């Protein structure tokens, strides 16, 4: 897999010359609108709430199936989106927090695999360790002992995804950055101290991150045909 070519994005995703991109993104946009308009309270635990939360990410997986050239990069992104949807559903129920975190960790590993390791950019890795690393250490201080290891492991995987996304650049880099921001706010709000409007910030940056990473698969503007 050539990660450099795989990560090239269209300069104008929704230009007049590419109306299919906008058309096939409309289910994602509409499902996001439904989510934010319904704004189901977090204490209302139901499969309906899980479906409403998962639907935008599943729409992005469908978008890739229609619009993106077939290949390993696209398939890895689709797998990551499906794992993310599983994580979204699990996080509706507090008791399923660890399985949800495991699902998102799997999604990040698939993103790392998709982004590849060329160019390596070890200096960027050092910067990421020196920047989000202390924040992760601070969050870990607020955890119960049995949560330290899984959260630390997840944080390291997330930083690896950020490293490879930024190394690839383009919309993948911006998506990786927003995903890290979303998870950072979620971690602080969940484990350290409740933040005002945290849920709105978390979900807005999360959906934007998944969209940007998805768009990195558009190496070719031509929809797949049978």
Curated annotation (Swiss-Prot):
Domain of life, per lineage: Eukaryota
Record-annotated membrane-spanning stretches: 24-40, 47-67, 76-93, 101-117, 124-140, 147-163, 172-188, 200-218
One Gene Ontology biological process: ether lipid metabolic process
One GO cellular component term noted in the UniProt record for this chain: membrane
EC number: 3.3.2.2
GO molecular function annotation: alkenylglycerophosphocholine hydrolase activity; D-lysine 5,6-aminomutase activity; ether hydrolase activity; identical protein binding
Signal peptide: none
Pfam families recorded: YhhN
Topology with respect to the bilayer: Multi-pass membrane protein
Extracellular side: 41-46, 94-100, 141-146, 189-199
Cytoplasmic side: 1-23, 68-75, 118-123, 164-171, 219-226
pH dependency: Optimum pH is 6.95 and 7.05 with lysoplasmenyl-ethanolamine and lysoplasmenyl-choline as substrates, respectively.
Known regulation of activity: Competitively inhibited by lysophosphatidic acid.
Reaction equation(s) it catalyzes: a 1-O-(1Z-alkenyl)-sn-glycero-3-phosphocholine + H2O = a 2,3-saturated aldehyde + sn-glycerol 3-phosphocholine; a 1-O-(1Z-alkenyl)-sn-glycero-3-phosphoethanolamine + H2O = a 2,3-saturated aldehyde + sn-glycero-3-phosphoethanolamine
Keyword Cytoplasm carried by entry: yes
Compartments, as annotated in UniProt: Endoplasmic reticulum membrane; Cytoplasm
Similarity field: Belongs to the TMEM86 family.
Subunit composition and interactions: Homodimer.
Name this protein carries in UniProt: Lysoplasmalogenase TMEM86B
Species assigned in the record: Homo sapiens (Human)
């Amino acid at each position: 897999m050539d990660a450099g070519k795989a990560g090239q994005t269209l300069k104008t995703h929704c230009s007049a010359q590419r109306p299919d991109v906008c058309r096939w993104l409309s289910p994602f946009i509409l499902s996001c609108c439904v989510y934010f308009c319904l704004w189901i309270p977090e204490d209302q635990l139901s499969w309906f709430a899980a479906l409403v939360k998962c639907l935008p990410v599943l729409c992005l997986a469908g978008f890739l199936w229609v619009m993106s050239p077939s290949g390993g990069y696209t398939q890895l992104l689709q797998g990551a989106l499906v794992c993310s949807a599983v994580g979204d559903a699990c996080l509706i129920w507090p008791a399923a927090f660890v399985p949800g975190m495991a699902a998102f960790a799997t999604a990040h590993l698939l993103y790392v695999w998709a982004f590849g390791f060329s160019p390596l950019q070890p200096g960027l890795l050092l910067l990421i360790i020196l920047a989000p690393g202390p924040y992760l250490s601070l969050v870990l201080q607020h955890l119960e002992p049995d949560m330290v290891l899984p959260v630390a492991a997840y944080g390291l995987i997330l930083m690896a995804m950020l490293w490879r996304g930024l190394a690839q650049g383009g919309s993948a880099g911006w998506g990786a950055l927003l995903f890290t921001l979303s998870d950072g706010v979620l971690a602080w709000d969940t484990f350290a101290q409740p933040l005002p409007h945290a849920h709105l910030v978390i979900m807005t940056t999360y959906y934007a991150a998944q969209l940007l990473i998805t768009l990195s698969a558009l190496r070719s503007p031509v929809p797949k045909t049978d």
